[in-house]
Swiss-Prot record:
Binding residue positions for [4Fe-4S] cluster: C545, C548, C553
Family matches, as Pfam families: ThiC-associated, ThiC_Rad_SAM
CC per GO annotation: cytosol
Protein's UniProt name: Phosphomethylpyrimidine synthase
Single GO molecular function: zinc ion binding
Gene designation per UniProt: thiC
Family membership noted in the UniProt record: Belongs to the ThiC family.
Residues that bind Zn(2+): H399, H463
Length: 571
């Protein structure tokens, strides 16, 4: 697939270094423009005989990092998908919107006569949508020639094509969460044959945070590399908070609809009804939510198994449905009405993230009968959703020790027919409070190397409190490290290239390129500057750092030894 590229400069608020430039790659099938950050290196480095003086980087920040665009949060982002003229051609305006409270004058749309408007539907028909072409360009990062020459594990391979994207979506091995009512979205793909993605959770609680703070956290998460964001608000103004987040988000937004439904019954789980939940789905569908976490797999028969656990049910949605089932002495209405749920989702192209209500909340509960019993039900629901051509991913644990992680991936592939796996960690120990983001990244790296498609981030506040923007940044960056490490383990030539360039810059003592090739350039620059200042070398472009100093730097001595060897007589 050939692409054309246009360039703009990158604003200071997006990257603190002007080496970064916002660039766009244009499609050939549809009028799509795929945004990237191109890093202009201060030096030229040779990797496998190919010179690199710049590197295109996958970018999730959207218009927020384009200096030619002025973003007003009160107005939201431009509806870029509308310009592709695809959504309007396949949908009709909603006749009677459930909720008319909106930031924009755009009228919500839906399928006509209940037909499927999903990416899976079009993929099965052999239609390449704008979203499919977009993600193919995005995954390649304009490095097609590098991929051909340096494919997985050093074996030459072909770049990702729109046709390959289509085949993976058709088979259910990948999803493109893209509600037709989220026109501000820049499409992305979740599947084990693509880059490992990460999700950032935000959302207010009954005790803290405002709409402005949550919008800021959503944009902040995108700026640092979150591929999707989940709004898990449980406090006041849930609808308005979600509206502002959606209108300002270039990444897919997920929710857990049962939270808002619970708010409508004043927090009394026993009073929930299918009709109330259905109306909540419609409300969020019309707003543009791209995927719903739905805890339809926890059944009455699982509850006695959960009672035997050390930490019971730790999923909020799972505990709500368990309480409802016991109080009403009925089966989970999300399970009994699942086909009706699918009938709604397919009209808006909303993906379903089948929630793991029985994920283990402690090491002692990992891989137990309750967890895997629910996983089998999620596999049944996957088949049912695919019958309606609804895109599906499966949520996973949780707290799992390292030696038990691989079994989770194996059973998910077996029970859930290779649908994408999306895990919370797993956290590999129970004693890492205050450092659970690191705990989660350890397990996340391993399970992603086995084939998990997306990692849900954990912040330093996990188990302790509501994260602020600094926690969001740290959680995102740490899980970007995990995702990148897994991509390396899986043989990604694009992931490998960035590491090769970093190593070259490090050996050349090119500090600016080292900062910019890292996942957090401002922090690396700040740490280095502070340490050099403390050692009395402020502002120097030194061929050493304060870890070893000028006399004990191994790389410096290695270069000196090589230089001396090269000029020895007789050589």
């Amino acid at each position: 697939m050939s692409t054309n590229t246009t360039h703009t400069s990158c604003p200071k608020e997006s990257r603190e270094d002007r080496a970064f430039q916002k660039t766009y790659a244009e499609g050939t099938l549809w009028p799509v423009k795929v945004g990237m950050q191109t890093l202009n290196l201060s030096g030229t480095y040779s990797c496998n005989g190919v010179p690199f003086s710049s590197l295109p980087l996958y970018d999730t920040s959207g218009p927020h990092s384009d200096p030619s665009l002025q973003v007003n949060p009160a107005e939201g982002l431009a509806p870029v998908r509308d310009s592709w003229n695809f959504i309007k051609s396949i949908s009709v305006p909603c006749a009677a919107p459930v909720n008319t409270e909106s930031m924009t004058e755009r009228h919500p749309r839906m399928a006509e006569d209940g037909i499927a408007l999903t990416q899976m539907h079009f993929a099965r028909k052999g239609v390449i949508t704008p979203e499919m072409e977009y993600v193919a360009i995005r995954e390649n990062q304009q490095l097609e020639e590098w991929i051909r020459a340096n494919g997985r594990g050093g074996t030459p391979s072909e770049p990702i094509t729109a046709e390959f994207v289509m085949s993976e979506v058709a088979a259910g091995r990948a999803i493109i969460p893209a509600n037709i009512n989220h026109p501000e979205l820049e499409p992305m793909i979740i599947g084990r044959n693509f880059r490992v993605k990460i999700n950032a959770n935000i959302g207010n609680s009954a005790l803290s945070s405002s709409i402005a703070e949550e919008v800021e956290k959503a944009v902040w998460a995108c700026r640092w590399g979150a591929d999707t964001v989940m709004d898990l608000s449980t406090g006041a103004n849930i609808h308005k908070t979600r509206e502002w987040i959606l209108r300002n988000s270039p990444v897919p937004i997920g929710t857990v609809p049962i939270y808002q439904a619970l708010e409508k019954v004043n927090g009394v789980a026993e009073n929930l009804t299918w009709e109330l939940y259905r109306d909540t789905l419609l409300e969020q569908a019309e707003q543009g939510v791209d995927y719903f976490t739905i805890h339809a797999g926890i059944l009455e028969k699982h509850l006695p198994l959960a009672d035997k656990r050390r930490t019971g049910i730790v999923s909020r949605g799972g505990s709500i449905m368990a309480k409802w089932c016991r109080a009403n002495k009925q089966e989970n209405f999300l399970y009994t009405h699942f086909e009706e749920i699918c009938a709604i989702l397919k009209c808006y192209d909303i993906a379903v993230s089948l929630g793991d209500a029985l994920r283990p909340g402690s090491i002692s509960d990992a891989n137990d009968e309750a967890q895997f019993g629910e996983l089998k039900v999620l596999g049944e629901l996957t088949t049912l959703a695919w019958k309606h051509e609804v895109q599906v991913m499966i949520e996973g644990p949780g707290h799992v020790p390292l030696n038990m992680i691989e079994e989770n991936m194996q059973k998910q592939l077996e029970y859930c027919h290779e649908a994408p796996f999306y895990t919370l960690g797993p956290l590999v120990t129970d004693i890492a409070a205050g450092y659970d983001h690191v705990n989660s990244a350890i397990g996340g790296t391993l399970i992603a190397s086995y084939g998990c498609s997306m990692l849900c981030y954990v912040t330093p506040k996990e188990h302790l409190g509501l994260p602020d923007r600094n926690d969001v940044r740290e959680g995102v960056v740490v899980h970007k490290i995990a995702a990148h490490a897994a991509d390396l383990a899986k043989g990604s030539p694009i992931a490998r290239l960035r590491d090769e360039l970093m190593s070259s810059a490090r050996f050349a003592f090119n500090w600016e390129d080292q900062f910019n090739l890292s996942l957090d350039p401002p922090k690396t620059r700040e740490v280095h500057a502070a340490s050099m200042k403390a050692a009395g070398h402020e502002g120097e472009k030194a061929d050493f750092c304060t870890m070893c100093g000028p006399d004990f730097c191994s790389m410096k001595k290695s270069k000196e030894a090589s230089a001396a060897s090269a000029i020895e007589p007789g050589r």
